[in-house]
């Protein structure tokens, strides 16, 4: 009887749904330990799941199923991050309402997830576009507003005419929108902004106690970008204003020979002289078409002289002011003092525009390059302060004290982190709970009037103006002042997609609560999330924003923990199948891949899998072994035609095969290429398990009711130990390898004893739950194995009875001996000496030392 995976998987998915097998009780138990395991919930795109999605979902499902068997009260929910620009763009492209497309996409995602057998508690399903959900998103915004953490500001922002919305910096690449590639320009616009900078230090400090990938923590540290330095004031020549500059190297002030402003700097227009205005204006127009990322990354730094001058406060020197796009208004003050002798960027700029370079720190050859290291200061003194002879840190401290005393500057901590631009001029997002009175004052909507619901529109395209589509709905926009009853207007911007995903993990705890965001008792029981799994692309934005909101809620007494996610894991990317490429020269001859360089004039030739073979760590042409081919796996994409739909895999091989294969591909965190051949091997493995328990001819049980022998028990208990430890370490691929070893051993036995089969099925169940449930039932159990106890291993049974040990004489292995695992040292040494090849090389009179490492090695050292 073949393994009937379609019938089995359908049967058990129906069983789990009908019995609500994985529903987590609403009430908090008195004495059961919790475990909250969470996936980063998906944006339900129109294309549905691809095979990359199930990787992380399978990993969390394994942990959830394992923890239930250990007696934990497990929370394992799923929901939908459905607001935002992608959903609206898809709706516009298909000419259907976003609500309709979102509902359709969610139904497709949910069907696919259920088909893969994930043990989600679907009773807790949430959707960020549900008014019952975004009521509380709006409520959180009001907490931010009341605490002064949400404010309006005229901000230079990326405006995309085609999309009709403002985009965040990270959504613009080289002056074009990330989605669609539409041109963008920087314009000032009224925006809601969240003061995340107020939490910068706490966001940094909180990283220390988190079990997160170090690379992710470092990305957040760099994004926050804390630095210590000084703000220095440079008086403008011929004007009453002063330029304020932030620098981390105030000790080099005596070496400042020019200044540079960002194109957006508020004083640029005042500083620019008539003679230079045309050049400055044109330069700024060009600069504002570039993204901040491109402005910083471009190798050739450009600029234009403004005609203005500023006074260096330490020596009274008048130095020229330039404008350059490598200076960002978003960092520091948007102005820098340039010290070309000791800054590489300033050095290149000074050489290009023939500006002075003045050494103030000894240690390098500034004619050749900037010296950025430590050293004694020179040429750094005025009548009141001298830095000469001081090294960098001493000089920084001395000049900062002087600046403070003279009121020419002040000690400052600065952050690269910017306040969070929180407005979108789109339709498909959470409305702001804010109204504006006739005199322009903004006021919060009373909490009892939440949610402010998103109106249904027949036409929801962007208006092409900063106001957004909601501004066109007069009967929705027009409202009253909640305090006076006078006419007022609603805020017509909407919140960004990040809003709903900042706090969803809390709503899963108490999804049906109409009175509060989350019940305090439930929150204290479940938080923080014990295991959070999702892609590394969210390392900064989502994870940083969620941490910020959580800390605000902590300060408000809504949550009991300072951090939301205790342990974070990023699953690796599943790449397309390996593609092979050979190269031919002009004569048509093959050129081996290791000889190919960028300058070679060669023709790439795709090679079929069957025409290559592996030779060590490389691939070669099967009929020309001397010719290496290029073997690469690429990210799955429609353009490459290498996207694999999980529905197709499940149709052909079953959900358990897909789950098991994705975990067996390699370590969870690594990128891995898809291999249909390897997946077929995993499917054969599941068939072998089926045949171990089920008779191939009769369809009855193939297990034996006889007592297992000691070797069978040892094999089982070693497998229990390995699988248990590997799940704890999230080494799922090696756990599967251990089960494969068990099956290989069991296939050599006359029959699989029931006492061995039963615990093995439990080991299998987190990985291949459908097959495990079926085998469990056939073994005579009338209840689901979902909450059956995880098997324990017996230390006595896994201890090796006999060990093999190498025996060395003067460091050279001369023999291998077998001894009892618990043998006394004297007995081991005696056995080692009796080994024929050891005795031949050993003279007792010359024996100097006997080295014995229990269970590992014996070494005799002679004179």
Curated annotation (Swiss-Prot):
Keyword Aminoacyl-tRNA synthetase: yes
Catalysis performed (reactions): tRNA(Leu) + L-leucine + ATP = L-leucyl-tRNA(Leu) + AMP + diphosphate
InterPro entries assigned: aa-tRNA-synth_Ia, Leu-tRNA-ligase, Leu_tRNA-synth_edit, M/V/L/I-tRNA-synth_anticd-bd, Methionyl/Leucyl_tRNA_Synth, Rossmann-like_a/b/a_fold, tRNAsynth_Ia_anticodon-bd, Val/Leu/Ile-tRNA-synth_edit
Top-rank lineage group of the source organism: Bacteria
Renumbered ranges of motif 'KMSKS' region: 635-639
Gene Ontology terms, MF aspect: aminoacyl-tRNA deacylase activity; ATP binding; leucine-tRNA ligase activity
Residue intervals passing through the bilayer: none
Localization of this protein: Cytoplasm
Annotated EC: 6.1.1.4
Keywords: Aminoacyl-tRNA synthetase, ATP-binding, Cytoplasm, Ligase, Nucleotide-binding, Protein biosynthesis
Main subcellular location: cytoplasm
Positions annotated to bind ATP: 638
GO biological process, one term: leucyl-tRNA aminoacylation
Motif ('HIGH' region): 42-53
Listed GO CC annotations: cytosol
Claim: Protein biosynthesis is one of the keywords in the record: yes
Entry-linked HAMAP family: Leu_tRNA_synth_B (MF_00049_B)
Family of this protein: Belongs to the class-I aminoacyl-tRNA synthetase family.
Protein name per Swiss-Prot or TrEMBL: Leucine--tRNA ligase
Gene source species: Salinibacter ruber (strain DSM 13855 / M31)
